[in-house]
Curated annotation (Swiss-Prot):
Its main location: membrane. Plays a critical role in the incorporation of lipoproteins in the outer membrane after they are released by the LolA protein. It comes from Pseudomonas savastanoi pv. phaseolicola (strain 1448A / Race 6). Belongs to the LolB family. This is Outer-membrane lipoprotein LolB. One of its GO terms (cellular component) is cell outer membrane. The keyword rRNA processing does not apply. The lineage of its organism: Bacteria, Pseudomonadati, Pseudomonadota, Gammaproteobacteria, Pseudomonadales. InterPro entries: LolA/LolB/LppX, OM_lipoprot_LolB. The gene is lolB. Residues 1-17 form the signal peptide.
Length: 205
């Protein structure tokens, strides 16, 4: 089940480039909508980061955990998994139009989009481009969402495209409040992301 785990998380943790800021969202919760808008504007300006952390995957017949490294440089990404989840290593790299997944001792897989790669390998349809937004604590701007704010006007939870995302804790890094512990709940798939180290960047200025 190693390849299945690798493809599931790697592709959920993917992006196909940053879309516009406009978001069709319903807002509720304890926070101030004006402060939330300012928070979104600040985080949307981040187009680069380096993340080190852990990821856990739970599905009806599969489960596992491992370490995560995610390098983002505008529309280029380099995501690596290792540890018990991989029992080895896997690396996912690409930019819009070209995605490659390399799995130790198992081969290389290519597609034009992460969605296509997931569909081809597993036959699953998931909003794999959304995590580039979700990992920053933002709803993806290209579809409707329902957000609940915490007392600090940051995301407490998010519902979008059949997924529920819970933000359990945040950490401040370089003036940005960024998610530290996140749980994603989809149909027959749960993902837990614990980010140990955030290094946010603004590259496109």
């Amino acid at each position: 089940m190693f390849l299945r785990h690798v493809i599931v998380f790697s592709l959920i943790a993917l992006l196909t480039g940053c879309a516009g800021l406009t978001s069709r969202e319903a807002v509720q919760g304890k926070g101030d909508p004006a402060q939330w808008r300012e928070h979104k504007q600040q985080l949307s300006s981040l187009d680069g980061w380096q993340i080190n952390g852990k990821v856990g995957i739970r599905a009806p017949k599969d489960s596992g955990s491992g370490t995560l490294f995610w390098l983002q440089r505008q529309d280029y990404y380099d995501i690596r998994l290792s540890g018990p989840l991989g029992r080895g290593a896997a690396r996912l790299t690409g930019r819009p139009g070209a995605v490659a997944l390399e799995v130790a001792n198992q081969g290389r897989y290519e597609a034009t989009t992460p969605e296509t790669l997931l569909q081809d390998q597993l036959g699953w349809k998931l909003p794999v481009s959304h995590l580039v937004w979700w990992v920053r604590g933002l709803p993806a701007p290209d579809s409707k969402s329902s957000v609940t704010l915490d007392g600090d006007s940051r995301l407490a939870s998010l519902e979008q495209d059949g997924w529920q995302v819970e933000y359990l804790s945040y950490v401040e890094q370089n003036g940005y409040w960024l998610p530290e512990r996140v749980k994603l709940h989809g149909q027959d798939l749960d993902v837990t992301l614990v980010i140990k180290d955030w290094q946010p960047r603004k590259l496109g200025q």
